[in-house]
Amino acid sequence: MASRVSAASQFAVYGPTFLDVVMGPLDGPPVPGREAWVEGALMCAGGAANQAIALARLGAPVRLHTRLGVDQMGQFVDEMLAREGVDTSSCERVGDQNVTVSLSFDGDRAMTTRGTTALPRLGGDAPACLLADVRGISANSEVVSSWRERGTWVLADTAWDEAGAWDTADLEALRVADVCTPNEEEALAYARTDSVEDAARWFASFGCDCVVTCGKNGVVACVDGQILRVPAPAVRA
């Protein structure tokens, strides 16, 4: 476990955590009954744990609020978080670890997941910053509102709508956020537009800045009413 620091100086990350098994790059999607060989493969902590580790590597004190499995796969994730200096004292221990297999091809990823998005309730002292998705913020609205009144800066991610309804009522949590980060598909679907720039402006109408992530095409942001476009750096998938 990471050394404890005061909550007021911490980044709190809230969301489901996964053991990610990542392989690629593939020339195309897998073909049933055939074996495809790739150059790269790794196992890492994904989901909220990935965000927590990224912040820890930047030198930020991080507290992760999530569920971690007590099985072998969960122990692997727990050990990785400990090595990275992430505070897991607020994590709930459950039987099975969430697992995702991620395959990279055509400049993006295809994922298959076993597990659940269920999470423990938020609580405790207000952190300096909170990273969570809109569902997590909505489920803990009283706590998040209380934290924000005490100065917590809130980053809200959006969530894929499996039902395809894209109900804007699901985004009410953005009204207590400082910035939101939908991906391109989510942004276009919620805003009912085919323009990423217009979608970014629409999300900003909730009262927060918006950064739309566009995969290999970088990001489009609406900050203080201005549209900014930033290309993605070249990296190996």
Q: What is each residue range found by the language model?
A:
Residues 2-17, 63, 79-93, 104-229:
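Ribokinase/PfkB-type carbohydrate-kinase core domain
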Residues 21-22, 72, 219-222:
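Short active-site-adjacent structural elements
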